[in-house]
Amino acid sequence: MNYRTPLLALLIAVTFIRCGNHDERPDVSGINVGDIHIDRFDTAFFGLDSNHIAAGLYRLDHEYPWFTGAFVSDILGAGPLADSNHVAFEAARQFLVSYLPIRDSLEPRYRRLDWLERQLQTGFRYVKYYFPRYKLPPKVVAFIGPFDGPGVALTTYSLAIGLQSYAGRNFSLYLTPKGQDMYPQYISRRFEPEYIAANCLSAIAGDIFPDSSDGRPLIEEMVTKGRYWWLAGRLMPDTPDSIYTGYTKAQLDWCTANESQIWNFFLQSNDLLYSVDPDQIKNYIGEGPKTLAMPDGSPGNIGAWVGWQIVKKYVSDHHGLTPLQLMQTPVRTIFEESKYKPR
């Protein structure tokens, strides 16, 4: 199968990337979501005295009763914050001491978060516009957790942002052998500030519409993932596609230039689209430096990109379809009625 370089498709791709899902944006300026304020749990935690960690944590729990317990038990993995749980206090103390240099490295970059508050406020307005019944997180909080901890987490009462996941692609600890083993460069290149709001809104989209495609045929997983990308474009109309898809612009251009060849690959691969074999599905859904059996220019997670094209084709044929209606439509229906056949 002959794959093309994206040069001839560049103009089309640029136009597509600029427009994409963003051409019918509503005016959300009048939607009230309140003032978005990011509570600085990170600053408060690393201001504790490590010699009096128990007293400090209890003060912190009084100030942040909606997050401190979740931080200790779930993010640090130390169990409940209780007098009888000495492991929790020791784990918190060790983490504070060992990660203080990390916090000091991040502090200049994230001293102010007003820019992020503005981005989230705009995103929350789009969420409320499309899904008025959804209850937005009442709190937004910044923390610094272990490097294998979440970059974004939705707790019962908050949207929590783990700044350790956004130290910059060239942050020294990401580039160590251990760091690269945990987060290879095709992942850590996205550990930049511009991905924070997109990751937050993607987490909210997943909270509104939990992913139930696990164990389903590959094509259903593809359309499910692609549908999330389509929704991300609606919730973040000013955000480049390269941010919420996780692709580089070059990868998006390559996919656009080779769309028909990519689709033919799936059609010619012995009922691959209907496979439920996890070992097969993981080659096309999920992180990876490239797609198995495709050229080096191909991105990983190519199945999500194809699913995205299928969703866009379906939406273009169903004028007036709302995001809620799309997200409630069975993915097999979306695939079959899209009659997706790229030229």
Annotate each PLM feature:
Residues G20-F89:
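N-terminal mature-domain "stem" immediately C-terminal to a signal peptide or N-terminal signal-anchor/transmembrane
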Residues T256-I281:
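Short acidic/His-enriched helical or mixed secondary-structure segments at domain edges of catalytic enzymes
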Residues D35-I38, Q121-F124, K225-Y228, A232, ...:
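Extracytoplasmic/secreted envelope proteins and their assembly/folding machinery
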Residues T15-R18:
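C-terminal motif of bacterial Sec signal peptides marking the signal peptidase cleavage site
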Residues A88-L252, N270, L324, Q328-V331:
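Acidic/His-rich structured neighborhood in mature extracellular/periplasmic domains
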Residues F46, P65, L76, K128-P132, ...:
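Sec-exported extracytoplasmic/periplasmic mature domains
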Residues M1-L7:
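Bacterial N-terminal signal peptides that target proteins for export
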Residues L272-R343:
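C-terminal soluble interaction/assembly domains
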